[in-house]
């Protein structure tokens, strides 16, 4: 990876480079670009909640806009200082023994009925077991056992739901809600209409005034089920409203306990922003304190010990991957790019929260690299670069030739090379996994992405405020979701032949919706700070332009309603039981959407990364759990 040169750019040199036979436009633009050396910031970067605009004066006197973002929070010395002993073989051997014992626990549920598993509890025990290993983050070891358990449960599923066991006379809410959620997440065809059976004669979900622990747990699972809604499922919306209100009220009545903490976690994060490794970390705490588990026929101590071991063993791999990532960041010349945010550790954390299988290092590191580059480009196109420079950069990138960088301002050369080298590197990794060259395909995705940024840069420069439709279509591309996901998923041990890839990547509905939610949610968190930096166009401002008299609150209500619809659409694209594309092929694109959504849950967590995002890094990457 080439380092960024800080030597002055000889402007005339680019005039003598033959960029291509069709590059007359590049040469013309190049003549208009002044020499640009290292820039001087008018204000130092400190952690800022306002994301105010600072002025930067370059060596040639060009006034440049720059967001006042805080610096990288995770320096090399800190990353190198992290230590862990959980990479030792003894921990892996202990985990393997526990995996074998948990498999025996699964298999015992398939044997003849005994004292612990009977016709009166065989369904709820299977569903509870599957739900537990998934929430603890250890399900990858039990794929066959999970399928066998759910096939069994589904064989007894009916339009009335299920009871605790196959011989239960009446369906109960807890078994049906948890069964519905788990079956739907695994692609089984289950109708949400089954939840209507738990309404009273007035069409309302019924509950008792006493709010017993058993009932609270049932409503908690109803709430969890309601979040896996498909478009048009009114009963799911009703269930979500009812159960959320019920659970909020229950927190005022019950004592502080593992149950109250579980309720708080689920209400706080829902499903779309409850990233799997974060949920595993939280559920380890809850699971170990839950007295209800002692009533189960399952040996919960073994599940808990395995979950802790797996969490910490992966933690040792994270340390090695972080050390590599920080070296890559330094060697790429990124530290010299003072005009942009540096959030490579945060992006790696998001990737490791949605894909913590050891074999998916390429995905985690590829995602972190791609997102780091996207952030550099975002800050360059939105604030630092001039329109003439950005046009030159966009045209040069489409040539895909290192010599094209000779015509660029000095600060852009480093950006060009990190993008060029990294995309080529990930393409080589993808070729190993997929057995075919995907570089041209990836380049087209990056070309579209840069074109969308160029459009936005022109809007900023001219002060043009587009219509909502104009902004939305361009904004889905400039969100960066596609370029962040495409090459990382191609490095995985999941086959993506062309007919599958087009159902996951562009022009699929899954890709469109994933890009949409990133654009819309990002706008709701960033539009005020963007406006302060001179970036007027957002879904909020464009909606207000199209609807004279609409307030910001009206616009936000409209955008939030769109987001809710998009989430249900995403659920359908992932879990449609009639889809010809396996869930495993779509899952990581979907989960990337969840990861980005988490980053915008409270604020712009990529600009202000020193609050919730920092906590996520510490809890899921830096700190192991106590065995």
Curated annotation (Swiss-Prot):
Residue positions binding Mg(2+) 3: 530
Annotated Mg(2+) 1 binding sites: 378, 382
GO MF annotations in UniProt: lyase activity; magnesium ion binding; pinene synthase activity
Necessary cofactors: Mg(2+); Mn(2+)
Keywords: Chloroplast, Lyase, Magnesium, Metal-binding, Plastid, Transit peptide
Cofactor binding, note field: Binds 3 Mg(2+) or Mn(2+) ions per subunit.
Name the record gives this protein: (-)-alpha-pinene synthase 1, chloroplastic
Taxonomy of the source species: Eukaryota, Viridiplantae, Streptophyta, Embryophyta, Tracheophyta
Name of the gene: TPS-Pin
């Amino acid at each position: 990876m080439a380092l960024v040169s800080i030597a002055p750019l000889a402007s005339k040199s680019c005039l003598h480079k033959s960029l291509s036979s069709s590059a007359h436009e590049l040469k013309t633009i190049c003549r208009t670009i002044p020499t640009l050396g290292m820039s001087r910031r008018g204000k130092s970067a400190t952690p800022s909640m306002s994301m105010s605009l600072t002025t930067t004066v370059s060596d040639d006197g060009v006034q440049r806009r720059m967001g006042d973002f805080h610096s990288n929070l995770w320096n090399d010395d800190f990353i190198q200082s992290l230590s862990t002993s959980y990479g030792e073989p003894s921990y892996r051997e202990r985990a393997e023994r526990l995996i074998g014992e948990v498999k025996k626990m699964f298999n015992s549920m398939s044997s003849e009925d005994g004292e612990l598993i009977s016709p009166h509890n065989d369904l709820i025990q299977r569903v509870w077991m599957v739900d537990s290993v998934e929430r603890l983050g250890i399900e990858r070891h039990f794929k066959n056992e999970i399928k066998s358990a759910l096939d069994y449960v589904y064989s007894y599923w009916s339009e009335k739901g299920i009871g605790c066991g196959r011989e239960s006379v009446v369906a109960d809410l807890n078994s049906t809600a948890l069964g519905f959620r788990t079956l739907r997440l695994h692609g089984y065809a289950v109708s949400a209409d089954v939840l209507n059976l738990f309404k009273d004669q007035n069409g309302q979900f019924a509950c008792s005034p006493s709010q017993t622990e058993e009932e609270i747990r049932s409503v908690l699972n109803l709430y969890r089920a309601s979040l896996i809604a498909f478009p048009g499922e009114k009963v799911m919306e009703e269930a979500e409203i009812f159960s959320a209100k019920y659970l909020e009220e229950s927190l005022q009545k019950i004592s502080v306990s593992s149950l109250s903490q579980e309720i708080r976690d689920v209400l706080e994060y829902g499903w779309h922003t409850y990233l799997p490794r974060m949920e595993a970390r939280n559920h380890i705490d809850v699971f170990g304190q839950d007295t209800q588990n002692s009533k189960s026929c399952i040996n919960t101590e073994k599940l808990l010990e395995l979950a802790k071991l797996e969490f910490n063993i992966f933690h040792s791999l994270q340390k090695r991957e972080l050390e590599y990532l920080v070296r890559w960041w330094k060697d790429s010349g990124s530290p010299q790019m003072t005009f942009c945010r540096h959030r490579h550790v945060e992006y790696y954390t998001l990737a490791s929260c949605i894909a913590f299988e050891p074999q998916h290092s390429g995905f985690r590191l590829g995602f972190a690299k791609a997102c780091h580059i996207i952030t550099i480009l975002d800050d360059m196109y939105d604030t630092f670069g001039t329109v003439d420079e950005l046009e030159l950069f966009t045209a040069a990138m489409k040539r895909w030739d290192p010599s094209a960088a000779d015509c660029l301002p000095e600060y852009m050369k480093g950006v060009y090379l990190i993008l060029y080298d990294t995309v080529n590197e990930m393409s080589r990794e993808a070729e190993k996994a997929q057995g075919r060259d995907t570089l041209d395909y990836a380049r087209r995705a990056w070309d579209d992405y840069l074109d969308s940024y160029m459009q936005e840069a022109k809007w900023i420069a001219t002060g043009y405020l587009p219509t909502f439709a104009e902004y939305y279509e361009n904004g889905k591309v400039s969100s960066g979701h596609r370029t962040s996901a495409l090459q990382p998923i191609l490095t995985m041990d999941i086959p993506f032949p062309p007919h599958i890839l087009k159902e996951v990547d562009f022009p699929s509905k899954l890709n469109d919706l994933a890009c949409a939610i990133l654009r819309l949610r990002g706008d709701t968190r960033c539009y005020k700070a963007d406006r302060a930096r001179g970036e007027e166009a957002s879904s909020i401002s464009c909606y207000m332009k199209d609807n004279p008299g609409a307030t910001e609150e009206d616009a936000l209500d409209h955008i939030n309603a769109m987001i809710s619809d998009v989430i249900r659409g995403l659920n359908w694209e992932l879990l449609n039981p009639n889809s010809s594309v396996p869930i495993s092929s779509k899952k990581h694109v979907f989960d990337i959407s969840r990861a980005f959504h988490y980053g915008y849950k409270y604020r712009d967590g990529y600009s202000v990364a020193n609050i919730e995002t920092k906590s996520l890094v510490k809890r899921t990457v830096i700190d192991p759990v106590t065995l």
